[in-house]
Amino acid sequence: MRTLWIVAVCLIGVEGNLFQFGKMIKYKTGKSALLSYSAYGCYCGWGGQGKPQDPTDRCCFVHDCCYGRVNGCNPKMDTYSYSFLNGDIVCGDDDPCLRAICECDRAAAICFGENVNTYDKKYKYYSSSHCTETEQC
C-alpha cells in the first residue's frame, strides 16, 4: 500500500496537496518527503495501524488523525495556498476546508522538524507486521 502512496505522489505532480506537504517537509527538515517519510514506521505513508514507533512516527499518527477530522474535504488532493516566511509556514486560505488541510500539513512538517534528530533509519520501510496495537486518535 505504501507503494501506492509513492505512485500517487508522482502522479499528482505540482498540483496536488501531497506535493505541497512534501515541500513543507523539505522546508522544515531539509529531507525529501518521498525518500524519508513515505514509508516510515507504522504511520508515515499510505494508511497506518499499530502504535507509533518513535517521535517521527507519532508526527504521522497525529497527521492522520488531523486529516480524519477534516470532513467534506479531500486532504490528499485539494490544493491550498501557503507561504514560507521567516522560517515558518503560513497557511493563507479563507476557505475553512483548505485552511484546515494546510494546518494539518503545517503541524506535521513542524513536528518532523522538531524531531529530525530522532529520525531512525531502522524504521524506514518498516514492516507493518510489527504494527499491531492500534492507538485511537
Swiss-Prot record:
**Enzyme nomenclature, EC number:** 3.1.1.4
Q: GO biological process: what's one of them?
A: phospholipid metabolic process
Q: Tell me the GO molecular function terms.
A: calcium ion binding; calcium-dependent phospholipase A2 activity; phospholipid binding; toxin activity
Does the entry feature the keyword rRNA processing, yes or no? no
Q: Give me the disulphide-bonded residues.
A: 42-131, 44-60, 59-111, 65-137, 66-104, 73-97, 91-102
Under Gene3D superfamilies, the record lists: Phospholipase A2 domain
Q: Which residues form the active site?
A: 63, 105
The reactions it catalyses are:
a 1,2-diacyl-sn-glycero-3-phosphocholine + H2O = a 1-acyl-sn-glycero-3-phosphocholine + a fatty acid + H(+)
Q: Which domain of life is it from?
A: Eukaryota
Q: Name one GO cellular component term.
A: extracellular region
Q: Name one Pfam family in it.
A: Phospholip_A2_1
Top enzyme class of this protein? hydrolase
Say which family it is in.
Belongs to the phospholipase A2 family. Group II subfamily. D49 sub-subfamily.
Q: What is this protein called?
A: Acidic phospholipase A2 Vur-PL3
